[in-house]
A protein has these predicted regions:
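Hydrophobic, well-ordered beta-alpha structural blocks that scaffold small-molecule cofactor pockets
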Residues: 1-48
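An accessory alpha-helical subdomain
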Residues: 129-213
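E1/E1-like adenylate-forming module used to activate ubiquitin-like modifiers
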Residues: 100-149
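Short amphipathic alpha-helix with an adjacent loop that forms part of the alpha/beta core around
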Residues: 59-69
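Structural motif
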Residues: 12, 72-73
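Conserved acidic residues
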Residues: 55-57
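ADP-ribose/adenylate-binding Rossmann-like module
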Residues: 73-80, 84-113
Length: 213
């Protein structure tokens, strides 16, 4: 499998199944997409900013639900293999991406694995074991949380500096931005939410290039 990042802004995601797994999937996608959760019952859990539809569709009714909701992605999170099979089949027939919460290992065309993620916006790090070991994914995610702390602020800072360095040669620009990213002083300033983090970064660039930004 090859990891891809998909922008679900403005897209619709259908989660079939209102148990703990369905709730977790709904919360995750609701950060960005319009989420509809379809289930006969709902747990006393948060489903994020999602719409809940109370219904118990049979496998034969799944195609009609997909046609009605028209999602970009459908998540099969029920405890019925027959129902999950029907969801997968109907999604495949319509060219809709699908994710099965009850399946690990290899996937067919059009089926996706939703990896564990660590966020420090706009930075996102994803970890996947191909759904073969969710426990390992969770462990690695916890390890990464401290590693990328502050990466979001660094991304915003270097993105701004890159725009300001647009007139210098690409080689000099890359070297300057790498120096900022490698600078412990800049990371420390960002970690303490210091207002002078930008000045520290420009000083690093000036030391390298002999010019100020």
């Amino acid at each position: 499998m090859i990891p891809l990042v998909h922008d679900f802004t403005g897209e619709r995601v259908l989660v079939v199944g209102g148990g703990p797994v369905g709730a977790r999937k709904a919360r995750r996608f609701a950060r960005e997409a319009e989420v509809v959760v379809l289930s006969p019952t709902f747990e006393a859990e948060s489903y994020g900013d999602s719409q809940r539809l109370r219904a118990a569709p049979d496998p034969e009714e799944i195609p009609d639900w997909l046609d009605r909701i028209d999602p970009a992605l459908v998540v099969a999170a029920t405890d019925s293999t027959d129902l999950n099979d029907a969801i997968e089949r109907a999604a495949d027939e319509r060219g809709i991406l699908s994710n099965r919460a009850d399946r690990s290992g290899s996937r067919n065309l059009g089926q996706v694995v939703v990896p564990a993620t660590v966020r420090d916006d706009p930075v996102v790090a994803a970890i996947s074991t191909g759904a073969s070991s969710p426990a390992l994914s969770r462990h690695l995610r916890q390890e990464l949380e401290s590693t990328i702390s502050g990466a979001g602020s660094m991304a915003e800072l270097t993105g701004s500096l890159r725009d300001e360095l647009a007139t210098v040669s690409s080689e000099t620009r890359r070297a300057a931005l790498r120096a900022v990213v490698d600078s412990e002083a800049v990371w420390k300033a960002l970690d303490t939410e210091s207002a002078n983090a930008r000045q520290v970064a420009t000083d690093v660039i000036a030391d390298l290039t002999g010019d100020s930004v």
